[in-house]
Swiss-Prot record:
PANTHER family: ASPARAGINE--TRNA LIGASE, MITOCHONDRIAL-RELATED, ASPARTYL/LYSYL-TRNA SYNTHETASE. The keyword Protein biosynthesis applies. It catalyses: tRNA(Asn) + L-asparagine + ATP = L-asparaginyl-tRNA(Asn) + AMP + diphosphate + H(+). The lineage of its organism: Bacteria, Pseudomonadati, Pseudomonadota, Gammaproteobacteria, Pasteurellales. Homodimer. The gene is asnS. One of its GO terms (cellular component) is cytoplasm. It is found in: Cytoplasm. One of its GO terms (biological process) is asparaginyl-tRNA aminoacylation. This is Asparagine--tRNA ligase. It comes from the Bacteria. InterPro entries: Aa-tRNA-synt_II, aa-tRNA-synth_II, aa-tRNA-synth_II/BPL/LPL, Asn-tRNA-ligase, Asp/Asn-tRNA-synth_IIb, NA-bd_OB-fold, NA-bd_OB_tRNA. The keyword Aminoacyl-tRNA synthetase applies. GO terms for molecular function: asparagine-tRNA ligase activity; ATP binding; nucleic acid binding. Keywords: Aminoacyl-tRNA synthetase, ATP-binding, Cytoplasm, Ligase, Nucleotide-binding, Protein biosynthesis.
Amino acid sequence: MSKFPTISEILSGKVAVGEEVAVRGWVRTRRDSKAGLSFLAVYDGSCFDPIQAIINNDLSNYQDEVLRLTAGCSVIVTGVIVESPAEGQAVELQAKSVEVVGWVEDPDTYPMAAKRHSIEYLREVAHLRPRTNLIGAVARVRHCLAQAIHRFFHEQGFYWVATPLITASDTEGAGEMFRVSTLDLENLPRGEDGKVDFSQDFFGRESFLTVSGQLNGETYACALSKVYTFGPTFRAENSNTTRHLAEFWMVEPEFAFATLADNAKLAEDMLKYVFRAVLEERKDDLKFFEKHIDNTVISRLENFINSDFAQIDYTDAIEVLLKSGKNFEFPVEWGIDLSSEHERFLAEEYFKSPVVVKNYPKDIKAFYMRLNDDGKTVAAMDVLAPGIGEIIGGSQREERLEVLDKRMVEMGLNPEDYWWYRDLRRYGTVPHSGFGLGFERLIVYVTGLQNIREVIPFPRAPRNANF
């Protein structure tokens, strides 16, 4: 074992009692006893719990430095691991020396002083908030989920593909995109029609930040069979809500020779895999969320893992909602996009389990979703989870060129703008499917937090791009 083990390694028993180590971290709290001892709670972020260091007053720098330590000071505490007589901790560190690496300039004005801070306040000091129990736990859970996603797809034979962040394509056809340009805003070049001449821009045409890696992912799925993307995406929606971000991460698998049923099975397997991983690897953080944020966090994940996914056609789901007797805020009729209240009723009250709603009306779904034989619906699906509603959206992709072209025209898109996407249907077309998982929504579900801005390090939202 290294002379500098992490606190996680020490507390998990990987360091033997009696071994001398040096712990590097930051002071959470200092407590002094009348017996001439000081107790330092030191954390390094490797796990939720700090380690307690016992400092005797015979250390040479005890009076001048140890007694001045406050929350946030960085230290290297060298000592021996001993069994702890106190409840709640198996071992502690009997210090032989304390080296102060960095002081907190003014403890009275330190933004992360040892007290409870509101979540709203923490957003104002996003550069310091990972030092709190809450955001530190979120960061570790986020890492665990990301690693589990990569492991799952690797084990399933999927290849990770890096899709571009700068694009000329609007995957959703919604137009809510951030433009990328190097043109001088004070002196825009214009054509004879008075419109901005983007041929003089950096890329020689209009370009945007991507809203999805899906279309690019499909190109590789039609060559490598099974691929996935995992990266940032951007939406210029002017939505200042607890559910929306302008910059967020998406997980988007695409696989060839796959039907909508295959897609639903992959989504179920992936969610259960990552939930098992976080329950096994981050129980310490989940217990914190269970105690302080949402007391159903752990049981909800366990119930999800042990539940069989229900499946229902959109048309039948509308019937269920109409017959429910519920007075929904948004009226129910065939052709609407299900709102959050509709989704949660289906998952939480009707099925009491995760549910896949499939075969939605074509007019409320994207152009690339495969048209069903009825001509009215597409082979789309949403995975609804108790406690949050939609967590995954996907579809079987339209592999027939003539149908794809017709759908594009219906939705006001120019097929020629998607010439490369159409080529996939011209050269060895194949049925294929995929879905999108909003990574931050997954973290919200796992942690029980109510605002999506708490689960990404530096949230980007309307009129908010600090740090």
